[in-house]
């Protein structure tokens, strides 16, 4: 089983947020970053699925060179491979982010074969967007289960567990 999990680098909870001198942006010079909590759950799920069914897991993130910290975190949990998509410092909206991730997935799959499962966190911890995973699934013409709290794989079939209400 080949599992890809996409993670987002977000400001650490409780971090002091400073604004740049011009008042137009967040000053990230002394800001601590972490992996979004929803993606931490997805990383753990990917590792558990590979432990149960064999195969390999890959973590992918886009960001500055410092985002390799989030990739090392995923590797410490047990993810086998890591991919960093370097980006400029410009603002990245969900559409642009999804397009970059889609392109990267297509490139990886053309070289190494398709992923059996692609996991995203339910929403980003910083902006609260629920869009990137949906946009990537649509662009790749893949099925999607939103709000899943876990996955069960039985041969070639999978079931996403979800809590509602």
Where are these regions (language model features)?
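N-terminal glycine-rich FAD/FM-binding segment characteristic of electron-transfer flavoproteins
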Residues: 1-165
